[in-house]
């Protein structure tokens, strides 16, 4: 057994990177039609999932770090034709179905949000991890707990994306 302590920043980054690799692999080569595929009228499409996952990472890492969200600061909201405060939390099935963003813009934001989130997390201090922040439910909790939730959501959503890809492409798409 080693005495090396696990660095929380590196651990969170490893989880974020794993889900980003999964969603990148699962979306590679998909058409616009496939990105918008919904198995039922009340399920999330891949395009919406990758956007929402990225918005949530950007919003939470910005809150914890005290930096502005790139969604607004870098004009992604405007390019996507959406309000700056929209994250996908609470979107209705109709909003999910209506979600359409040009592929290059969507994946431009997805990549930018991933990279800025990793950068922010790499620079967080122990004090920032224990600071209380208000969650989307209104609950005050330490930033590390919210970060754990973001990692869990990222894993769930990247898994949903991979599942949808499998539904469309069948066995062997990951080769």
Annotate each PLM feature:
Residues 9, 13-24, 34-89, 132-175:
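Short, contiguous alpha-helical
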Residues 83-131, 148-150:
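Acidic/histidine-rich alpha-helical segments that form the ligand environment
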Residues 16, 20, 27, 110, ...:
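Hydrophobic alpha-helical core bundles mediating ligand binding, dimerization, or RNAP-core interactions
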Residues 1-10:
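Basic/polar N-terminal segments that are highly enriched at the extreme N-terminus
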């Amino acid at each position: 057994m080693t005495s090396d302590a696990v660095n929380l920043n590196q651990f969170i980054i490893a989880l974020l990177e794993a889900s980003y690799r999964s969603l990148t692999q699962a979306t590679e080569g998909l058409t616009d039609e496939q990105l918008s595929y919904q198995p039922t009228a009340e399920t999330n499409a891949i395009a919406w999932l990758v956007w929402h996952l990225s918005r949530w990472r950007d919003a939470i890492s910005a809150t914890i770090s005290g930096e502005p969200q790139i969604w607004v600061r870098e004009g992604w909201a405007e390019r996507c034709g959406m309000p700056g405060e929209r994250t996908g939390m609470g979107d209705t099935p109709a909003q999910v179905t209506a979600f359409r963003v040009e592929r290059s813009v969507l994946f431009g934001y997805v990549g930018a949000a991933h990279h800025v989130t990793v950068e922010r997390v790499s620079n967080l201090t122990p004090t920032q991890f224990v600071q209380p922040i208000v969650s989307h439910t209104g609950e005050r909790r330490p930033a590390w707990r919210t970060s754990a939730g973001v990692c869990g959501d990222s894993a769930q959503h990247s898994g949903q994306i991979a599942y949808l890809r499998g539904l469309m492409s069948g066995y062997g798409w990951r080769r």
